[in-house]
Amino acid sequence: MPRCLTHSARPRAGTARVSAERLIGFLGLCCLLLHCAGPSGTAWAARAAAGDPVSAALAKVGLTRETARVNRNDMNFFGGDRYRLSLFDALMDDPLRIPDLIPVLASSALSSSRSVGAATVFAGLRVKAGVRRGLIGDVVAGYEKRLKKPNCLLDAVEQLYEAASRADVVELDAGLPKLTAALPDSLAEPLALLVLAAAEGVKWQRLAFESIEDRDILFDEAIQYVSGLDSDKTDPGLTRRVEHAAGLVDYDYLNTGATDIAMVLDSVVVRLARLASSGAPWLKKLSFTCRTPLGDIIVNGTDPHVYRSALAPLLVVDLGGNDLYLAGGSTQSASNSISILIDVAGNDRYVCPASASRDTSGGSWEAAAGGIDREKPSFGGAVLGYAFLADLGGNDYYDGRNLSQGAAVLGVGVLCDESGDDRAKSFTASQGAGLFGLGIAINRSGNDQYHVYQQGQGYGYVKGCGLLIDGEGDDVYVANDTDIVFPSSQSKEHNTSLAQGVGFGKRADYVDGHSLAGGVGMLVDARGSDKYWCGVFGQGCSYWYGVGILADSSGNDEYNGVWYVQGSSAHFGVGVLHDALGDDHYRASINMAQGAGHDFSVGFLLDESGNDVYDAPNLSLGGGNANGIGVFWDRKGDDTYNVSAAMTLGRANIDAPRGGLRDRMLCLGLFLDTGGKDKYSKQFAGNGKTWTQPGPNESEPVPTERGVGLDR
């Protein structure tokens, strides 16, 4: 899918603000002391630089922290973009700040995952469409004040009808006042809060999409656009129409409505969990249904239930039992633009109708599957709207197809699983995938398994942010590389994964010139010994002005990939893998891995501590190619470096015919190991050594190829 035109490149938000203020104050104090101290201050600065391994290594090749970067003006000679993000600029302009910035960003993501509302705000901010609802005032309290007794749910539904105000809107059920009045306040109030938030969401959606002429057609074409991103058979006219429409959307308005619903959802799930745990006898056989312009409201008690695929609900609340879902929590049409599913307890199964016939449990759901379009979103998947799925407990099974399990195009899609040992399977654009929108997958605890083929597990396409945040547990992340259905341009024997922290853009400079800058993809795992597998493009990787981040906080982890993996980037991207604690094993089999940047890109692998093993290919461990910057830094531990190729351990190659502009532009490979007794397969590298390496074209060397390694 991504074409790389080269022949050789085979903490909490408040805490973050306080930390930033302290850092600024500290730097200001240092500058003041240096200014006042005169010559002795200069000497103090020199000694400080000598103690900095980064500065010490760079000095060996005539660089400083200030000059070791991709010059944006140089980059602009070759690349064009739209939707370029400020996060990309910040990291590209000063890549050696990555060890300071990325851990804070990952910590903020993890803190935000305690609240669906906070996570929605966090994701929006990454793509310059963040709306800080609740920064001043309490959003939920505002909705609570609007509850009108004695029949608050009826009033909320009436407000939703008014907000929808469509010519084809269904009429209010005649018996609804009696039905809603019969519900106790402990149930009616949380339902009413969500319906009120949905009514406001409709208004924000109308503002966001007011320049879109036909949302029904766009709904179907947006799904086809996503499904065809790795196909040469995609209709060019459809592509132009979807991308034109995406440029008309007001993403600030779009995310405003989603954020309100997310914040109300955080409050509602607490109330519903309290209600379910009360053990009230009437909960067991509870059953309530009513129509709304956006789909049905369905509420069931603690008995097991089956939710048929023909449903396109606005809201499903299930208070317990081992349930089977073939629908719910996903938008099914432009008119079903908001869908919320809350399951309070039970070992539940969420099975996309397209996946029902390949269920592996021995049962068959084909009879219930019906004729639902197999490409439509499912279970936290949104198109042109909002989808939320909250599962509060149990060992659950998720089986999707496309746009599932926290994914969105032109919308916001969220999956939040509170606890349990869960399994999630999907095909493409799932498990934290944002494309012209926000896709968020949160799993707070449990030993979980994630399986996808492509575009998932923290994937951000154009104007999109994809987040997969896992709180704790020994987890397994797989981007399938054995069943080859997306053969990569780099190696047909492997899939193009685009998974596990990937920011990805549309490169069209060699097609029609209409390139689009990539988004932000983040996979953040807090605790546990985890295993990661992917093919090509994954594990902290980016392409075409995207930002891809994989951050793992602790555990003895295993990383397995092929090409453009483990802190690498191609063509104007920033890719980072940050592992904080544990004895880890990194394996990459072919090329461009473990701190490698290609073509005005930055690739960075930072491992903070542990006795680690690196099985590295060519262009790795601090490999710069085609004016890219590759940085590798293992800070502590007794490490082992198994390498046989030449372009590794701090080496750079401009990889272009001599005499062009690229000869005058920096290409850097930087390797750092700053602690422990290490083992190297290369004789020139070793404990306590510093080394430099020339570019591979020794007959025509250029001074802008800088390669250096340092072991302390």
Model-derived features: positions:
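Terminal non-domain segments
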Residues: 2-4, 19-302
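N-terminal segments that cap or nucleate solenoid repeat domains
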Residues: 256-337, 347, 385, 390, ...
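Well-ordered beta-strand segments characteristic of repetitive beta-sheet solenoids
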Residues: 296-300, 313-319, 335-344, 362-366, ...
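Extracellular beta-strand scaffolds
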Residues: 303-306, 313, 321-326, 331-332, ...
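Acidic/polar low-complexity surface segments
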Residues: 351-380, 431-432, 456-459, 478-514, ...
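Solenoidal tandem-repeat scaffolds enriched in leucines and small polar residues
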Residues: 404-413, 430-440, 449, 456-524, ...
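Leucine-rich solenoid repeat scaffolds
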Residues: 670-712
